[in-house]
Amino acid sequence: MQTIQQLTCKSNEYHFLPTCEIIDWPAFRIRGFMHDVGRTYISMAELKKEIDLLSKFKINVFHWHLTENQAWRLESKIYPELNAPENMSRMPGKYYTLQEAKDLVAFCKQRHVTLIPEIDMPGHSEAFVKTFQTDMQSEKGMTILKQLMDEVCETFDTPYIHIGTDEVQFINPQFVPEMVTYIRQKGKKVISWNPGWQYQAGEIDMTQLWSYRGKAQSGIPAIDSRYHYINHFDIFADLVALYNSRIYNQDMGNEDIAGSILAIWNDRYLSDEKQIVAENNLYANMLALAERSWKGGGYGYFDDQTNLLWKNDTGIYTQFVDFENRMLWHKEHTFTNEPFPYVKQTNVVWRITEAFPNEGDLTRSFPPEKEEKESYLYKGKTYQSRIIYGAGLYLRHVWGDLIPGFAG
């Protein structure tokens, strides 16, 4: 249906389709994005707008990270104290009603998008602990959590419930197996972060890889989100690698590799939701992921390439130029008046020289300041220079040594 909508043309008050034959299918079955509303509340109107816009590019999953240390953002009628302002440490009193959640599920379905609600457990749960004065892994905590899962499963007419399980010390070995079984008995499939609880095939329905340490397991479908975080506050930090990299280093999805979800983690507080979109360069990054997850293929993986462009005499560079031109067209015509800070970078060229030794003297000058050359002779040693393309020039990427810098 999204392909048909993409082909639809409008003339005056009429809509029409051109006569054509299309052979097209997705390389990966999951192509999504995640919002961390547990840390920072985002209005329902903004969420719907983003889902609507991105669904036009065949993004088919919205991952809704609803709970965090800072707040429990989903209304509970059985435990309304969870939503009390005094139990939220950021944006107190802001949460989504159960009816709003149901409406968003219906909104997503109309756009062929699957909503995945996440209730993070047993970690990232300080709001829960503050409310009930007990850990989720305690007997009391599990009793409360099961009642909350009854409410969540009844509210969300969706196939999956995400239970987190990341970044936590497990003190109750029965907690995760018992919660997975309980939610499955409600007719839901269960997703869990990896690294997190260790599962064998059949013990979980899907994992989501959040760290470079995350590994897909045979018999358990995996979502690759390992380097798909975009909260780096630099519009050029991620896009080239997102576009070029193969998803989990695979050309196509299979039984064990389901696809990818790009994540905005609101660790830093931004009160303006448009600022969240702009500073994370959401739309441009999502178009890169949308194309790669639909078409498949790519070149290498994030950890073996920089965020710079390939040389301009390569087919990879030519493909990115084509993508960039189409993306900038959509910036003007589809995302009109939306925060879309990306600008053309295929015309950005640098000449980078090897480092000259200043021996701590910041006032010292060197030959490149006077003349641009391919190499320089300085105090009997030759220093080379090279041409680099693109705006993602890093001495050290925000991922640290996991991603090569421009000299890598």
Predicted regions and their residues:
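Acidic, contiguous N-terminal accessory segments
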Residues: 1-26, 153, 190-197, 201-205, ...
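Hydrophobic faces of well-ordered beta-strands that scaffold small-molecule active sites
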Residues: 31-35, 62-64, 115-119, 161-163, ...
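Active-site beta-loop-alpha junctions enriched in small/polar residues
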Residues: 33, 38, 67-71, 120-124, ...
